């Protein structure tokens, strides 16, 4: 099992190519390239902050 270094991340063998971020979680991308992202992604319910961490959406504004 692969591990991720950043708190709130989980390793995936086939994650979305359009992960949610603080910039797009209110209006998620509608058209993502097909395929799988292999690597560490934020766990469900968390989004990627511009500082690289995984946060709950209300924390995007801090």
From Swiss-Prot:
Expressed by the venom gland. It comes from Scorpiops jendeki (Scorpion). Keywords: Disulfide bond, Protease inhibitor, Secreted, Serine protease inhibitor. Serine protease inhibitor. Transmembrane segments: none annotated. It is found in: Secreted. GO terms for molecular function: serine-type endopeptidase inhibitor activity. The keyword Disulfide bond applies. SUPFAM superfamilies: Serine protease inhibitors (SSF57567). Belongs to the serine protease inhibitor-like (TIL domain-containing) family. Disulfide bonds join 4-40, 14-36, 18-32, 22-60, 42-54. GO terms for cellular component: extracellular region. This is Venom peptide SjAPI-2. Residues 4-60 form the TIL domain. The keyword Disulfide bond applies.
């Amino acid at each position: 099992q692969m591990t991720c270094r950043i708190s709130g991340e989980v390793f995936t063998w086939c994650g979305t190519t359009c992960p949610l971020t603080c910039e797009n979680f209110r209006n998620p991308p509608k058209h993502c390239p097909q395929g799988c992202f292999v690597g560490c992604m934020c766990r469900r319910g968390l989004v990627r902050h511009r500082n690289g961490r995984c946060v709950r959406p209300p924390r995007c504004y801090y």
